[in-house]
Amino acid sequence: MSAFNLIIGIVPRGSAELLTHAAVEAGAGGGTIMNARGTARPGEETFFGMDIVPEKDMILILAENAKVQPILDAIKALPCLEKPGTGIAFACPAENFTVLGKKK
């Protein structure tokens, strides 16, 4: 069993900095933020007959197992994520990884 988990958060564009700050306050060592697009069902959101693709931020955080639940709890408690369907965060075991680069 791995001693680490990869926490993945998918939230509305602009929320990633708040999420990352909350995660660091809860014990994360940092994270990676990437731009992403949602895949809402076609026709669900339209503007003048064109489908609108929701802009998202995706956050990746590698954390020790003991820190995963406190980090997820801190993310869930953010006021910007209180509305149902705002985003999702989950953790998966991180297996077979290595740190890249030479030690200084």
Question: Language-model features: where?
Answer:
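Positively charged, small/polar-rich N-terminal and surface patches that mediate targeting and assembly
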Residues: 1-104
